[in-house]
From Swiss-Prot:
GO terms for biological process: DNA replication, synthesis of primer. This is Replication restart protein PriB. The gene is priB. One of its GO terms (molecular function) is single-stranded DNA binding. Pfam families: SSB_1. Keywords: DNA replication, DNA-binding, Primosome. Involved in the restart of stalled replication forks, which reloads the replicative helicase on sites other than the origin of replication; the PriA-PriB pathway is the major replication restart pathway. During primosome assembly it facilitates complex formation between PriA and DnaT on DNA; stabilizes PriA on DNA. Stimulates the DNA unwinding activity of PriA helicase. Residues 1-101 form the SSB domain. Homodimer. Interacts with PriA and DnaT. Component of the replication restart primosome. Primosome assembly occurs via a 'hand-off' mechanism. PriA binds to replication forks, subsequently PriB then DnaT bind; DnaT then displaces ssDNA to generate the helicase loading substrate. PROSITE patterns: SSB. One of its GO terms (cellular component) is primosome complex. It comes from the Bacteria.
């Protein structure tokens, strides 16, 4: 098996919760990350937005707090998701979520 693990901290910009037809609870977030990192001895501004998916009952205790403006750290794996219009994007599937505020 190859490694697929990402840890990313940021601010929630959108959040919605729904249950799948199978009855599984899902929360979908848009996470905005801003930081500065050194690359080739130069300081670089880093910015990204990524969709985060939390699935299952294990996140029920934290989902009430996952609203726009809340800072979190997410650990999980990346997966390719294709939208209805055929656009591909990377999605972070959460395995652990930690509130930062």
């Amino acid at each position: 098996m190859t490694t697929n693990n990402l840890v990313l901290a940021g601010t929630i910009t959108r959040s919605r919760r729904f249950d799948s037809p199978a009855g599984i609870a899902h929360t979908v977030l848009m996470l905005e990350h801003k930081s500065q990192r050194y690359e080739a001895e130069m300081l670089r501004n880093v910015y990204c937005q990524i969709q985060v998916v939390l699935s299952g009952e294990r996140f029920n205790s934290v989902t009430e707090n996952l609203k726009a403006g809340v800072e979190i750290q997410v650990e999980g794996f990346l997966n390719l998701q294709q939208s209805r219009n055929g656009q591909n994007r990377l999605v972070l599937h959460a395995e652990n979520v930690e509130l930062k505020t």
